[in-house]
């Protein structure tokens, strides 16, 4: 347990940030899963719409340092490859 006053404050803010990040990651995973489901069902319109949302969420996560930039780029590339299978 922290004895220093500032560290106690930091622990509070770190916990708030951790909970916010968990929520954000969960929402991102849900959208990515929706893209994969749309591809399995060969629903082009739904896949493209969800792909756009997934890109937005991943980019936002990278800018807020929730995700590493390489992780985001890799996921975006893999999702695009997946969607391209039903587009062609």
UniProtKB/Swiss-Prot annotation:
Record-linked SUPFAM superfamilies: Ribosomal protein S20
Region (Disordered): 1-20
GO MF terms held by the record: small ribosomal subunit rRNA binding; structural constituent of ribosome
GO cellular component: cytosol; small ribosomal subunit
Domain of life per record: Bacteria
InterPro entries named among the record's database cross-references: Ribosomal_bS20, Ribosomal_bS20_sf
Record keywords: Ribonucleoprotein, Ribosomal protein, RNA-binding, rRNA-binding
Designated name of the protein: Small ribosomal subunit protein bS20
Organism name: Phytoplasma australiense
């Amino acid at each position: 347990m922290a004895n220093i006053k500032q560290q106690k404050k930091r622990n509070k803010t770190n916990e708030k940030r951790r909970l916010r990040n968990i929520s954000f990651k969960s929402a991102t995973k849900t959208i990515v899963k929706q893209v994969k489901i749309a591809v399995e069902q060969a629903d082009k319109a739904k896949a493209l719409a969800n792909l756009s949302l997934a890109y937005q969420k991943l980019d936002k996560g990278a800018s807020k340092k929730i995700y590493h930039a390489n992780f985001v780029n890799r996921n975006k590339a893999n999702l695009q490859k997946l969607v391209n299978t039903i587009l062609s």
